[in-house]
A protein has these predicted regions:
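Conserved N-terminal catalytic/coupling substructures associated with nucleotide/phosphate chemistry
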Residues: 1-119
Length: 119
């Protein structure tokens, strides 16, 4: 079933990412922390924001595996989330839905420091 991109305007509950930044995961993991610490939200991978353009992902299952791995290692405690492959304009993308959590604050943990983000 196609994903309704028109329903998701980038704002406080939605963030678009052209691709998974593995060398700079902080760029999207801080959004995971912020969504978990507030009202939840979606990170949609495979969509450029400015101008909005669906570019898709070459290997969405690998992206899903890496997202799951990095969230478990870098967000403390691990938030509630759902990650799934979605079709947008005929291209494979990934929707990471982060739910607000009962155990906040949720921290981005890296190199001995813990930082909580909010939106």
């Amino acid at each position: 079933m196609p994903f309704p991109l028109d329903h998701y305007i980038e704002a406080s509950h939605v963030d678009y990412k052209e691709r998974l930044e593995e060398k700079k995961p902080r760029s999207w993991l801080k959004s995971v922390s912020a969504f978990a610490n507030t009202e939840g939200g979606h990170l949609i991978f495979g969509v450029k924001n400015e101008p909005r353009e669906v570019v898709g992902l070459e290997n969405p299952q690998a992206v899903i595996s890496r997202l799951t791995e990095l969230i478990k290692v870098r967000i403390d405690p691990t938030p509630r989330y759902r990650v799934r492959e979605v079709e947008i304009e005929g291209k494979s993308c990934v929707d990471l839905e982060v739910q607000d959590g009962p155990a906040y604050p949720y921290y981005y943990a890296f190199d001995g420091s813990h930082t909580a983000y909010v939106r």
